[in-house]
């Protein structure tokens, strides 16, 4: 089991998942990538090494970490995936952020990068990359999504799940960040239920 954290997270979060996968070795991936083109190299190299040492490899990935994994890995490197609040359509998210920041495509193309007041820097290079590199994903996948996720809409995640034959579970009242006791209990139950299914 390889755990991939979200923004601001750490590989140490993998410890939490050890009790949920008692028969497996669980390790956290302490990646450095900030963009999908960096992740393409770093993730594929790391997972290739892990794959050479193990017959089966399962991915557990969170938020932006899930997006990097979706953008850089394939069924040759991963046998199964559990995605928690994944960013599955980065183009849509960037376009939403542009609206929040009142930035047009023309402005972004001219300035290349624009800092926002909500802590994100909009990048023309990033937007162009995700448009030119759509996600191709053929790994058996379970997705956990919070009803009130503020980064990805239910329509977007549902469309992704349908297109990629992923099993989607929606937590009523859930958020993008699963962190309360109730949310973590829901996550635990979701992982155990998905683990019982055979692909």
Report the location of each language-model feature.
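Catalytic nucleophile-loop/oxyanion-hole region of alpha/beta-hydrolase
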Residues: 28-51
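Gly/Ala-rich beta-loop-alpha elbow adjacent to hydrolase catalytic centers
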Residues: 60-69
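Short hydrophobic segments within beta-strands
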Residues: 2-7, 60, 84, 144
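Short, surface-exposed "cap/lid" segments of acyl-processing enzymes
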Residues: 1-34
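Short, surface-exposed alpha-helical segments at coil->helix boundaries
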Residues: 11-18, 37-40, 154-158
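Short coil/turn segments at beta-strand junctions that form active-site/ligand-binding loops
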Residues: 24, 54-57, 79, 139-140
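The alpha/beta-hydrolase serine catalytic core
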Residues: 77-159, 163-170, 174-199
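Aromatic pocket-lining residues of Rossmann-like dinucleotide-binding sites
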Residues: 72-73
């Amino acid at each position: 089991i390889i755990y991939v954290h979200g923004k601001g997270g750490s590989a140490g979060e993998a410890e939490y998942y050890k009790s949920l996968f008692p028969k497996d070795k669980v390790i956290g991936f302490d990646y450095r990538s900030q963009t999908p083109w960096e992740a393409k190299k770093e993730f594929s190299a790391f997972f290739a090494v892990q794959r050479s040492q193990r017959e089966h490899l399962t991915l557990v990935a969170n938020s932006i970490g899930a997006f990097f994994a979706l953008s850089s890995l394939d069924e040759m490197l991963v046998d199964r995936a559990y995605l928690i609040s994944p960013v599955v359509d980065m183009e849509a998210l960037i376009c939403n952020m542009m609206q929040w920041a009142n930035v047009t495509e023309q402005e972004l193309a001219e300035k290349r990068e624009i800092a926002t007041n909500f802590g994100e820097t909009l990048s023309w290079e990033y937007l162009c990359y995700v448009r030119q590199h759509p996600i191709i994903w053929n790994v058996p996948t379970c997705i956990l999504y919070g009803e009130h996720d503020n980064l990805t809409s239910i329509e977007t995640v549902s469309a992704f799940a349908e297109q990629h034959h992923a099993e989607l579970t929606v937590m009523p009242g859930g958020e993008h960040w699963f962190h309360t006791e109730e949310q973590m209990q829901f996550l635990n139950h979701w992982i155990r239920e998905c683990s019982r299914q055979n692909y």
